[in-house]
């Protein structure tokens, strides 16, 4: 029988496969794609997903090893600078690996402890964890739409 940690890690890994599959389809020319006057490009959203995964590992899971300058969160808008596909892929991969390692380190009792963040208040770690899963899925869906219908 799997532990809570193993089950939650499986859920996260399966949900994140949608992002990986989408990334496999992205070309350098896609990074600037937006829909009409929408504020975010594919490049920005990829950087944002990785920024937030790293912030999550640092602030929600309390990892002292993670160092992150979350430019997309700081700037709060697409500055047009996220145009290097290889660099974005590395950053997304590194963020995913960091978060995966942190999830795997959790003890069974950790999932029921309460944490508090400015973004979503007081939640159990398991409830907070659902936020990163849904955040990644939400923006991955946006990326898919931008890739299919967007214009640079």
Region locations from a protein language model:
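Generic structural signal for secondary-structure transition and capping sites
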Residues: 17, 28-31, 54, 97, ...
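Acidic/histidine-rich alpha-helical segments that form the ligand environment
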Residues: 77-113, 127-132
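Hydrophobic alpha-helical core bundles mediating ligand binding, dimerization, or RNAP-core interactions
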Residues: 12, 16, 23, 92, ...
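Short, contiguous alpha-helical
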Residues: 5, 9-13, 20, 28-74, ...
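Basic/polar N-terminal segments that are highly enriched at the extreme N-terminus
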Residues: 1-3
